[in-house]
């Protein structure tokens, strides 16, 4: 099977989908080698998608669908994703948090590497909880609903990816994506 992404993706976004694909293929209990996974980016405008800041969101959505586990609906997230499962920094985090708050989201997952970049306006302080993460297993732990299922999925992912959480290592240096 293959991962097919549509919606006017630029080069960086296409690479991001490939990283997500690698994590999903490592992660899933199911044999997905004979399944095609379609990812459609909607409302991308004429410029399309040029960045990797939706990587953790795409990975969470696909894993949720494959494993039939719901995603919390009061949550927004942004972050790039390495093939090892590390959540990498992205640009524009403050703006994204404020937009999520305006849209009614109660929690926002961001890369831990971006935590010091956050300078949200006072009016948004009490509207959202900002949750910094460094690994996809942390994203899934927060985002997926159903405690027993989530615990099992997160434990499995930590085993498969050799989680930075277990060995104490941190993602290597990376420059934020433009999105």
Predicted regions span which residues?
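Peripheral, non-AAA+ core regions of ATP-driven protein-machinery
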Residues: 1-179
């Amino acid at each position: 099977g293959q991962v097919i992404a549509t919606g006017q993706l630029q080069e960086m976004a296409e690479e991001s989908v490939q990283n997500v694909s690698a994590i999903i293929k490592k992660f899933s209990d199911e044999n997905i080698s004979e399944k095609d996974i379609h990812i459609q980016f909607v409302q991308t405008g004429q410029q399309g998608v040029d960045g990797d800041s939706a990587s953790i969101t795409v990975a969470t959505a696909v894993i949720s669908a494959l494993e039939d586990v719901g995603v919390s609906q009061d949550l927004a997230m942004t972050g790039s994703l390495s093939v090892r499962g590390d959540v990498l920094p992205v640009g524009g985090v403050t703006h994204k948090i404020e937009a999520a708050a305006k849209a009614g989201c109660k929690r926002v997952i961001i890369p831990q590497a971006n935590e010091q970049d956050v300078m949200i306006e006072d009016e948004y302080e009490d509207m959202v909880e900002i949750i910094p993460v460094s690994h996809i297993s942390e994203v899934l732990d927060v985002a997926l609903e159903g405690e027993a299922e989530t615990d099992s999925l997160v434990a499995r992912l930590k085993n498969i990816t050799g989680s930075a959480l277990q060995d104490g290592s941190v993602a290597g240096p990376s420059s934020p994506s433009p999105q």
